[in-house]
Swiss-Prot record:
Name of the molecule in the record: tRNA(Met) cytidine acetyltransferase TmcA
Organism: Vibrio cholerae serotype O1 (strain ATCC 39315 / El Tor Inaba N16961)
Family annotation (InterPro entries): Acyl_CoA_acyltransferase, GNAT_dom, NAT10/TcmA_helicase, P-loop_NTPase, TmcA/NAT10/Kre33, TmcA_C_sf, TmcA_N, tRNA_acetyltr_TmcA
CDD domains: NAT_SF (cd04301)
Positions that bind acetyl-CoA: 502-504, 509-515
Pfam (any one): GNAT_acetyltr_2
Top enzyme category: transferase
Gene3D superfamilies: 3.40.50.11040, 3.40.630.30, P-loop containing nucleotide triphosphate hydrolases, tRNA(Met) cytidine acetyltransferase, tail domain
Swiss-Prot/TrEMBL keywords: Acyltransferase, ATP-binding, Cytoplasm, Nucleotide-binding, RNA-binding, Transferase, tRNA processing, tRNA-binding
Enzyme Commission no: 2.3.1.193
Length: 708
């Protein structure tokens, strides 16, 4: 950084002299006026270029407080936010963990107190509220973090402009700060708004894919376009995203444009139109009528969801952050857009590059991208690298801190593979000593990684408290679940490694790298057993089954963001309690199929059935079942025997048809089955059921010579 030219700062120099004169008049020490003068000059420079600057105020608490107290009145007409519950007159203070509640708002001065604690998600959310011409002031030291996480954050803060009671840095070079054309800033956003409106006014089946980096006004454009449509016609618009908080700016901008509208949480209504949020799982389940579907942060949602919505809604916009934790770089383009171009050849796409809230080349945005690895891209895997042998190794926390380029590669894999990776995950990886990171390399390219956490080895009083429901120790999901929900205390006493994430480079998948990673990880990380918990899908489950993990607990509710049921699986040898866990799992999940798991996909049920332990069954009248299959009896008279028979034979069946799963095991209505399998009504559904039962009977007779 170099000091600015004299001409560029005649204005800010005048401010400096004014502050010095004021200090002399009121008896304020020059030790204080030097930082104040500097910060006011810095703000003028920021305003000149609509950019943002960050400063780290390093000094004792009394100096910091006095400096802020003196500075705040200069920002009296502008919104000021402080992250950290320190009382400061004229400043809105929020808990350091609650920055997300400021999504959709703006501030000109953002103060962050590190002594209160550190939450990376909260910090990243609130940093987006700081507009061009604004300043970030970091105060205090990150004393609540352990060594590696603290070193990472301190190094990040040292890359800001560091101010002490004795010294201030040179002002940034004015040549790097150029004035922004406000009209040009909004040109791209206007184009985005018009493109969204065109989805409604143009031909059907021409979805729009809208992509952007953070801060480009993508979500705001969705809200502004929705408001224009609602004001010009009767419109019912549905919005979905991983969380309601992610689309809060959409509703804020829609209401600002529609001052007469009534707004409540996740909804804006006018006399003739509505804009409402629906969680992804609810939207998938209920499939409401809608004139326009807006899917924000689409890259963070499961691909099967997006495909279903494309088929169901013929006027839809899919928007996504390409860099940052909300998106997944080119993975979104590879997975979804390529599929969409085949299914909807008339689709359109638009990428926003111009920032809205700050100027291009913003200093603070570049800093944020570096610190939180927001622009980490998956590296290309060259053909010659793909031929190199795999090497496996531990990537320790100190190595992560000292080798940020390698860490960025690994983290790009994690972000690409998992829809819920967040800034806090980066700091958990650096902070939590129970976590470990295990990586696979081909040459210089990281092609796979395992992130795992050590669990278990709990003492008897803790286990008893867990089983009574009075304690739930953080970071012990598997032993807590086994002790509390399955009543297996022995598992909580034993040691466990739980796999939090496993990721393989998209160019290297289907080559067995994931299985090799697991094998090498288990060989180098001893424990009594290993576990994993994930949103179960027909794509993921076969991988874990093939690697000798067995299911022991299936959640009863879908995750709102992923839309999947959570499945806990374990792997271990000579575990006295494993057979008991398998029997409990079999009884529980089969029982829940007709209740809380009625919406579980038949394909997943097919994959789980072979893991089901055969339970003692009553005498089954096969003759009655055969007569029904051939057209006799009625369904109600044999339903109980069909259910018992399928459960008794399921472990030996290679594949049970989705129709029999839905009607007999999940006990769905005739109407629901007709809709699901596109049949005309009960008669056609029942005929299909009879046909499939007869085929199953014949198949089993051939295999086991059953007397039917």
């Amino acid at each position: 950084m170099f000091p600015p030219s004299y001409d560029a700062f005649q204005g800010v120099t005048a401010i400096g002299w004014a502050c010095a004169n004021m200090a002399h008049h009121f008896g304020i020490s020059l030790v204080m006026t030097q930082p104040i003068t500097y910060l006011l000059q810095l703000q003028q420079l920021a305003k000149q270029g609509q950019t943002r600057f960050g400063c780290w105020l390093r000094g004792d608490a009394q100096w910091q407080h006095h400096l802020l107290k003196t500075l705040v009145p200069h920002f009296a007409e502008q919104p000021i936010l402080m992250l950290g519950q320190t009382e400061l007159e004229g400043v809105t203070c929020v808990d350091y963990r609650q920055g997300q509640q400021w999504l959709g708002r703006e501030c000109q001065l953002l103060i962050v107190d590190l002594t209160q604690g550190w939450d990376a998600n909260s910090f990243n959310a609130v940093l987006g509220t700081l507009v061009g011409g604004g300043l970030l002031l970091v105060v205090g030291e990150p004393t609540t973090l352990n060594h590696c996480a603290r070193v990472w954050l301190e190094r990040a803060c040292h890359r800001l402009l560091v101010i002490t009671p004795q010294t201030v840095p040179a002002l940034p070079n004015s040549d790097s700060v150029t004035r922004t054309n406000t009209e040009q800033t909004y040109t791209e956003q206007r184009l985005a708004i018009d493109s969204i409106i065109k989805v409604v006014t143009g031909h059907r089946k021409r979805p729009l894919v809208l992509t952007a980096d953070r801060g480009r006004g993508k979500t705001s454009a969705l809200g502004l376009a929705a408001a224009e449509l609602m004001s010009s016609r009767s419109m019912h618009i549905v919005v979905t995203a991983p969380t309601l908080a992610a689309v809060e700016p959409l509703f804020v901008h829609a209401q600002r444009t529609l001052p007469q509208a009534h707004r409540q949480r996740g909804e804006v209504q006018t006399a003739q139109s509505s804009l409402r949020f629906m969680a992804p799982d609810e939207l998938l389940r209920t499939q409401p009528e809608s004139d326009l579907l807006l899917v924000d942060e689409a890259a963070a949602l499961p691909l099967p969801f997006l495909k279903r919505w494309v088929e169901r809604y013929h006027r839809a916009v899919f928007s996504s952050t390409i860099h940052g934790y909300e998106g997944c770089g080119r993975g979104f383009s590879l997975k979804f857009q390529s599929w969409l171009q085949v299914q909807r050849p008339q689709m359109r796409s638009l990428h926003l590059e111009q920032p809205i809230r700050w100027a291009a080349g913003d200093a603070l945005e570049q800093w944020q991208n570096q610190v939180f690895l927001l622009q980490s891209e998956l590296p290309e895997v060259a053909l010659e690298q793909a031929r190199e042998p795999l090497s496996f190794s531990l990537f320790s926390q100190p190595e992560c801190v000292e080798q940020p380029e390698r860490l960025a590669q690994v983290f790009a894999l994690l972000v690409n593979a998992h829809y819920q990776t967040s800034p806090n995950d980066l700091f958990a990886l650096l902070q939590d000593e129970a976590m470990t990171l295990f990586v696979a390399y081909q040459g210089e390219v990281c092609v796979g990684c395992v992130l795992a956490v050590r669990e278990g080895e709990l003492d008897a009083p803790t286990i008893e408290a867990i089983q009574l429901g009075t304690r739930r120790p953080k970071g012990h999901l598997t032993p807590v679940t086994l002790a509390n929900q399955l009543g297996i205390s022995q598992a909580a006493r034993q040691s466990c490694w739980r796999i939090l994430r496993i990721a393989v480079h998209p160019d290297c998948q289907r080559q067995g790298i994931g299985s090799q990673l697991l094998t090498h990880f288990i060989a180098q990380h001893h424990a009594d057993y290993y576990a994993t918990s994930f949103g179960v899908s027909e794509d993921l489950l076969p991988f874990w089954l093939a690697n000798h993990f067995v299911p022991i607990k299936l959640g009863s509710h879908r995750d709102q963001a992923s839309g999947c049921y959570s499945l806990l699986m374990v792997r271990g040898e000579h575990l006295d309690w494993l057979e008991q866990a398998k029997q409990q799992f079999s009884a529980h999940w089969i029982f829940e199929l007709s209740d809380s798991l009625q919406a579980l996909e038949p394909q997943i049920i097919q994959q789980l059935l072979p893991s089901t332990v055969a339970l003692p069954q009553p005498l089954i009248p096969l003759e009655l079942i055969e007569r029904y299959a051939r057209g006799g009896a009625n369904y109600e008279s044999v339903a109980v025997w069909l259910y018992a028979w399928l459960l008794a034979t399921a472990p030996s069946l290679e594949s049970l048809s989705p129709l029999l799963i839905s009607k007999i095991l999940q006990r769905k209505s005739w109407a629901a089955c007709a809709e699901q399998f596109q049949l005309s009504g009960k008669r056609q559904v029942e005929q299909a059921v009879r046909t499939e039962i007869l085929a199953l009977l014949v198949n089993l007779q051939c295999k086991y010579t059953l007397p039917i």
